[in-house]
Each structure stands twice: as structure tokens, then as C-alpha cells.
A protein has these predicted regions:
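Secondary-structure capping and boundary motifs in well-ordered enzyme cores
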Residues: 59, 73-81, 100, 104, ...
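Hydrophobic/aromatic-rich, well-ordered segments within soluble, folded domains that form packed cores
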Residues: 137-155, 334-347
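Catalytic alpha/beta core of large soluble enzyme barrels
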Residues: 64-73, 114-118, 204-377
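Function-dense linear segments that define catalytic or interfacial modules
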Residues: 34-132, 142-149, 219-245, 250
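Conserved, charged catalytic cores of large soluble enzymes
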Residues: 1-60, 141-190, 319
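Short coil/turn segments at secondary-structure boundaries
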Residues: 2-6, 39-46, 119-129, 192-196, ...
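Glycine- and acidic
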Residues: 12, 85-96, 120-133, 150-166, ...
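Internal maturation/activation junctions in enzymes
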Residues: 103-129, 133, 152-209, 262, ...
């Protein structure tokens, strides 16, 4: 895998019309559309929003990880450690107002301590242990975001989902920091956190969670929209048909959960937009049309996706595995606009650009990416 590290100075040159910069930027976007890579690390956005502990010690972020959600300091003496877990937003109503977030941070800090104790003195682990001891960075994230919205009858796009984004991720920020302060009082502040009142330099990062989302009730992965409402998936055990469980429940309620409907959705690449029988169905207290709520990844305005990600990034001290999806006919102008807006919104990293695998409603390729198993699960 490859990652392009892009600075603010370069982006301002692109913005001002510098021919050389625009030519290089165009090649980068063309490569992302053709192959899905390279990932992008917006270095300026990342380092401007570094936590107080990093700024105090002059620590900079120079790279990200294989899934683009980790933004931690590295140098000749320090290698970052991924210590991650994810909250299931499909079950948000069950755990909101509880100590789940608080307890999850204590759990992750304990996991990191076990890594430190077991890895001390082992060949090849010196830099990782040193980094973990000094910063104790964690990455609590989420999965099931699109499932949560669909269960509420809310579209991925618009003010309603933006409100939910602020509500949930601000809560995660507040509760995770409360836990880190309690940990610091109990066990002390590590070197890089001295004077901050926190036990951890970082607390939040959102991983892809493709595998973990399946194990958690077949919910949507990470903060990503469903690629399709029904799709074929290949694994070592064979080929399976997976259906959006929330849509299936609604179709059953309206006596439309039948093979004719599902075969039509599959034929249409996982989309329900062409099915007239679904035109008049509305959901939730806002009477949102079913077809708005169950738009697939490729049908969602990618600028809306970026706007939502920009809001979320304000509450995430590391980064987010953020994919973008474009049809093969997407113009260079549109792809540039979406990527440029990501930089302007303060987004730190961009993961894959999805094209044909999303359009087919077939996520077999997506599920089989050789991404990091720790991030994936």
C-alpha cells in the first residue's frame, strides 16, 4: 500500500493555480480513481490539531498506518502502537448514558499495559514499547453508523445526520477524556502527558471494522455507508448473499420481503431507487422517504460524506478510515472538488477511493483487502 503525504503549502499552490502543483495533484487523483490508492495524509491538518501533549513536546506526525486512522508520532526511536476497540452504534440507545465509553477506555489502557509488560526487552519491540510508555495512545472508535441512522429512519445526508454526528461523537469525546483523567489520578501521567491531567495522549480513532461489523450483527462498517442493500460476498467457506437487515425488517412489515424484490435490488447493484413499489413508504417521525434512508455508498453525495466527516473530525484526536466512492463516469472536476473539500474541512486522512467494486453491489474485493487485521476486526 502507498500513502501520499500532502502539506498545506502544496495544497495552497494547487488552490492558487500553480501549474506544476496542479499537474501532480491531478496525477494523484487519477491514480486514486484507477487503483483506489494512494491513501492521503493531510499533514498540515493533522499536526495543527495535535493534542496538547504533542504540542508541548514538539512531536510531529509524519505518516499514518495501513488503514489510515492512526496519526501518532514516529521517529528513529519511536514506533506507534495500535490499541483499538469499537462501540456498536446500532446499539447506541442501549448504552447511551451508561459507563460503556468510560469502561472501554479503562479496558484499552489495561490492554496497552499488558502489551508493554509482555514486550519489554524483546527484540524488535524497543521503539514500540518506548512510544507506548511515553504516550499511552489509544483509539476508541465506532461501527454501525449507517445502521444506526437507518434504524432511526434518518438519511445519511443532511442536517439530521449532522446533528446525530455532533451529539454522539461529542459524548464519546467527553466520556473518554473523563476516563483518561481518572486513570491519570489512579496510575499517574506518562512522560508526554505530564501537566495535561490525562493518562493518554490520544483516545479516539475510527477503524474500518469490516469483519467486526459482521460479527456484531451484520451492521454497517465503521462510519461508512452500506455499499449495497444486498450483495454477494466471497469467503473461504463459499459465496453468500447478504441483505441489509434493517431494510429486510421494513420490507417484511410492508409485506414486500420476497425474492422478486430482492432479486431486483441485486440486479440493480444493491440499489432500491428503481423499485416503484417502495415509492410511497416513509420512515420515522420526520416521514423521510424510504429511498432516501437506504441510499447506497455510491448514491450518497460525496460532499455530504466529507462535510459529515469534517464535523466528526473535531471530536476525534487521531483520524478516521474514510473511504470515498465515485462512479466510473465521475469527472476529474468533481473528484477534485470532493478531495479538496476534505482538506478544507480539516480531515486528516483519506483511505480508499471505491469505484467498480461499489457499483456492482459486490463487496467481495472490499472485504478481502489485505488491510490490518487489528483495524479490520
Amino acid at each position: 500500500h502507498q500513502c501520499a503525504v500532502v502539506g498545506d503549502k502544496f495544497m495552497r499552490k494547487v488552490e492558487s493555480g500553480d501549474k506544476s502543483a496542479r499537474r501532480l495533484w491531478g496525477k494523484l487523483l487519477q491514480k486514486r480513481k484507477a487503483t483506489g490508492e494512494p491513501y492521503i495524509l493531510f499533514k498540515g491538518n493533522t499536526n495543527k490539531s495535535n493534542p496538547a501533549a504533542y504540542k508541548k513536546h514538539g512531536l510531529k506526525v509524519h505518516m499514518t498506518n495501513i488503514c489510515s486512522e492512526i496519526t501518532l508520532h514516529t521517529d528513529e526511536s519511536h514506533s506507534f502502537v495500535c490499541c483499538l476497540s469499537s462501540l456498536n452504534l446500532a446499539k447506541y440507545d442501549e448504552w447511551k448514558g451508561t459507563n460503556l465509553i468510560y469502561d472501554a477506555i479503562w479496558f484499552l489502557d489495561g490492554v496497552l499495559e499488558e502489551f508493554i509488560q509482555k514486550s519489554k526487552g524483546k527484540v524488535g519491540f524497543h521503539n514500540s514499547v518506548r512510544s507506548a510508555e511515553k504516550g499511552r495512545a489509544l483509539g476508541l472508535g465506532v461501527l454501525g453508523w449507517h445502521t444506526y441512522l437507518q434504524e432511526k429512519g434518518l438519511p445519511f445526508e443532511g442536517l439530521l445526520s449532522q446533528y446525530e454526528t455532533r451529539k454522539i461523537f461529542s459524548q464519546i469525546k467527553i466520556e473518554s477524556e473523563r476516563a483518561s483523567m481518572a486513570l491519570a489520578e489512579t496510575f499517574g501521567e506518562p512522560l508526554w502527558c505530564v501537566g495535561t491531567g490525562l493518562r493518554n495522549t490520544h483516545l479516539r480513532a475510527i477503524a474500518p471494522t469490516v469483519s467486526n461489523s459482521k460479527l456484531s450483527g451484520n451492521v454497517s462498517p465503521g462510519i461508512e455507508p452500506w455499499a449495497a442493500n444486498v450483495f454477494t460476498e466471497q469467503s473461504a467457506k463459499g459465496t453468500f448473499i447478504r441483505k441489509n437487515p434493517t431494510l429486510k425488517k421494513i420490507l417484511r412489515k410492508h409485506k414486500l420481503d420476497n425474492e422478486i424484490i430482492w432479486n431486483r435490488i441485486l440486479k440493480d447493484g444493491g440499489s432500491i431507487q428503481g423499485i416503484k413499489a417502495l415509492d410511497k413508504i416513509t420512515l420515522g417521525p420526520h416521514d423521510i422517504p424510504l429511498k432516501e434512508v437506504f441510499k447506497t455508498f455510491k448514491e450518497i453525495n460525496q460532499l455530504e460524506l466529507v462535510n459529515q466527516a469534517g464535523i466528526r473530525q473535531q471530536y476525534i484526536d487521531q483520524s478516521v478510515s474514510l473511504n470515498l466512492a465515485f462512479p466510473s463516469i465521475a469527472t476529474p472536476k468533481w473528484i477534485n472538488k470532493v478531495h479538496f473539500e476534505a482538506w478544507k474541512k480539516g480531515i486528516k486522512t483519506l483511505y480508499y477511493t471505491r469505484t467498480e467494486s461499489v457499483l456492482r453491489g459486490d463487496i467481495a474485493e472490499q472485504a478481502m483487502d489485505d488491510s490490518c487485521l487489528s483495524c479490520d476486526g
